Amino acid sequence: MTATSLKTLTPPSKQGLDQNRRSYWITTFGCQMNKADSERMAGILESMGYCEATAELDADLVLYNTCTIRDNAEQKVYSYLGRQAQRKRDNPNLTLVVAGCVAQQEGESLLRRVPELDLVMGPQHANRLETLLQQVDSGQQVVATEEHHILEDITTARRDSAICGWVNVIYGCNERCTYCVVPSVRGQEQSRRPEAIRLEMEGLAAQGFKEITLLGQNIDAYGRDLPGITAEGRREHTLTDLLHHVHDVEGIERLRFATSHPRYFTERLIDACADLSKVCEHFHIPFQSGDNALLKSMARGYTVERYRRIIDRIRDRMPDASISADVIVGFPGETDAQYRRTLDLIDEIAFDQVNTAAYSPRPNTPAATWDNQLPESVKVERLKEINALVERNARERNIRYQGRTEEVLAEGINPKDPEQLMGRTRTNRLTFFSATSPDGHLYQPGDLVNVRIDAVRSFSLSGTPLPSNALH
């Protein structure tokens, strides 16, 4: 069976595009929330008659959905903008848009820095893209960064996958971590109603989607802003209740959620994840530091001991669960002993994956003004050491998969080998496997396949599908 028999699943909104229409190009920087916002904005553009360009330099409208979580991400945006500003000077008909967190942070000052811009819009205005572009078409330069109630999303997003989809459930962040710019650029928490979330998931299931990731900046804070108290005296709307509410959506085989905050990760939530069969055994729970004094300086609102209890409870209920996290090294005042405690915690927890970052001072955050900043050389050295530890631990965690059979959701064709499919296990391991089983059965993207793991690497697995065992 040749690879040409494999189906390349195209999201419905990408099919049959008329190349004679005005075209757009979106470049997304940063987190999953930005990726979900970009999908919605692409859907708005296509509902306006735009089609996706084949290349950025061919597009009639270029939109950068930006990230300001660290300085290097922000500087990359300005590099891209410089190139497009020259295009705009050569082609006044080009529409140039900056969306997302850099737009929210800089506002009108972006127009002074890049006068060629047509539209500057913060993340709370993503669903207003059509209205804002209409103002641009009337000859205005538009800045939309005021605090705004996020309208319920009634657009059809242009999904980047036809199998796995994002669904936003809560926008914004009410935390005040001393290093983080997110609350000032994404605004206060705004939770969507559970009925609207379920309706969106039902629509995705009808299109053939198999896996949904529920998204929020602090997703386990979901529902704090929604009214309602139960007879037991607890909030009526929590992430736990939401998982129960959407778990039986027909056609959806897997549920994930991200990103969690240790402050709100409850035993009740853990028990629901263990009891609900569609919830995958993978949890992304940032810890940021292994030192309590630093966690207090960061205003994280929990201790290392609480974090340990959460992980212990997860592994008690779901022994094979994978845990990923975020960590910052080089935070102001971090001593060598405090840094070593972070290394020790990484070893102790045996994380499956850790996203590491050197502390980067951000505008309008308390930590950026402190006098005890660490030299860049110290940050770089600590980051290098911690990355080596993370990679070693990830490989050691993956070794236990050798020879096991894992359920893998085939998400697409391996771009490096057209005879292979690629997908993820329930524990979020990227896995490559032959599209053809030993008995000649050809699996397709969207199939749930039992795969025997033959080889492991630090951040991926590869294996062989068992004979004729596509689960769906």
Swiss-Prot record:
Database matches in CDD domains: Radical_SAM (cd01335)
InterPro entries: Elp3/MiaA/NifB-like_rSAM, Methylthiotransferase, Methylthiotransferase_CS, Methylthiotransferase_N, Methylthiotransferase_N_sf, MiaB_methiolase, rSAM, rSAM_horseshoe
Keywords: 4Fe-4S, Cytoplasm, Iron, Iron-sulfur, Metal-binding, S-adenosyl-L-methionine, Transferase, tRNA processing
Cofactor comment text: Binds 2 [4Fe-4S] clusters. One cluster is coordinated with 3 cysteines and an exchangeable S-adenosyl-L-methionine.
Chief subcellular location: cytoplasm
GO cellular component terms listed in the entry, alphabetical order: cytoplasm
Domain TRAM: 399-467
Function: Catalyzes the methylthiolation of N6-(dimethylallyl)adenosine (i(6)A), leading to the formation of 2-methylthio-N6-(dimethylallyl)adenosine (ms(2)i(6)A) at position 37 in tRNAs that read codons beginning with uridine.
Name the record gives this protein: tRNA-2-methylthio-N(6)-dimethylallyladenosine synthase
